[in-house]
Amino acid sequence: MQESLKKMWSGRFSGESSELLEEFNASIGFDKNLYREDIAGSKAHAKMLGACGILKPEEAAAIVAGLDAVLAQIEEGKFEFKTADEDIHMAVEKRLSELIGSELGGRLHTARSRNDQVALDFRLYVLRQNEQIARQIREFIATLTSLASAHLDTLMPGYTHLQHAQPVSLAYHLLAYAFMFKRDFERFISSHERNNLCPLGSAALAGTPHPIRRELVAQELNFAGITQNAMDSVSDRDFALEILFNISVLMTHASRLCEELILWSSQEFGFVTISDAYSTGSSIMPQKKNPDVAELIRGKTGRANGNLIALLTTMKGLPLAYNKDMQEDKEGVFDSVRTATSSLAILNAMMKEAKFNEQNMLAATKKGHLSATDLADYLVREKNVPFRTAHFITGKAVAHAENLGVDLSELDAAQLKSVDENLDENAVKFLNLHASKEARTSAGGTANASVRKQIEELESWLSKSGD
């Protein structure tokens, strides 16, 4: 038989594979990333076959030793991945057979299909990445919490519609992101727990007549249990969709933060100075200092979203059980994982070195009439004015301030009284911006007491989530 026909599945074929097919069909170029998982799964499978008497103990031991040798060759850069090997499973098995002999090497695939093998490999990879990304998220939450602790009294405008809305602290603003990322952490952990089941032993789609014990493989690989239906096991890519979705939401949160860093670092805002270590210059304009890291994270978010939509679209029309379309599941996941891990690493480092310009933030609170809601609330609480009427009166006060060319917080008692008789001298103290921030004592509010509780909650969570 010619070399091109010497494939694990070549017995049924009498013709040669087209070179076009060889290139088009092969996944070895990217699924070689799964070599650790593939070898770990094969070792667990061989041990189980030995424990069940399907292989002799010495055969199982020889296969495991051979797989260790293959792993060492790959990690030492001595393993040549070839397109003709088709995928990582065939590449590893072929090299194993070269090392220990084809008769013994050929026994490894007993009671196993590439369908459940790839389901195992890919699931192991995704579970490992769930843990890695969750660790990085936790580290970033710790950074945000530390920054918040340092900026309890840094006053800045809170925004809606990118317009000045109400005074808040920088600590409060940063904590909003900390709680966003905490939800991201919880999504990755939840997905890990839900998908921590071993599919190996499902074979092609219907299980196997060999007397295997799937739970032994699950235990060897530290799974919580085994999947319950073989057809579902080889068809399932929910775990891949989940990590793509979780990364998309994570990157969306990172993108929103980066958008603000981009705005805040501009001359128009001047709220933050990004370290030179995480900025770049212009090839023509000598004065430029560009927030390229933040812009790249913002841009890479679209890439992560695209990977999610691509796999959703691939999976939506597939009949049970395995289809070759599912080979398209991996590159997007690999790409999104690289995107998420690299983005989190550099975002965390950049935030640690960011310098917030407290005076510029404070100056910005003197624009936009940030105390307007407090004035309306005063009328409701102290003068028993219906809120809609209070809203109207306060709007008139804002218009009066603008006619005078000042901020609402700068109006004196006489100027307020000229707008409406309910705006007496007591109303003036409700225009104080620090007092405005401190007045919001409701749970989750901007008052320092509330913000400290939020910080304490996160610090307590951080101490427990590292277990």
Swiss-Prot record:
Pathway: Amino-acid biosynthesis; L-arginine biosynthesis; L-arginine from L-ornithine and carbamoyl phosphate: step 3/3
Keywords: Amino-acid biosynthesis, Arginine biosynthesis, Cytoplasm, Lyase
Enzyme Commission number(s) from the entry: 4.3.2.1
Principal subcellular localization: cytoplasm
GO cellular component: cytosol
Gene Ontology biological process terms, A to Z: arginine biosynthetic process via ornithine; L-arginine biosynthetic process
Gene Ontology MF: a single term: argininosuccinate lyase activity
Superkingdom of origin: Bacteria
Reaction(s) the record says it catalyses: 2-(N(omega)-L-arginino)succinate = fumarate + L-arginine
Pfam families: ASL_C2, Lyase_1
Subcellular location(s) per record: Cytoplasm
HAMAP family: Arg_succ_lyase
Alphabetical list of NCBIfam families matching this protein: argH
Family stated for the protein in its record: Belongs to the lyase 1 family. Argininosuccinate lyase subfamily.
The protein, known as: Argininosuccinate lyase
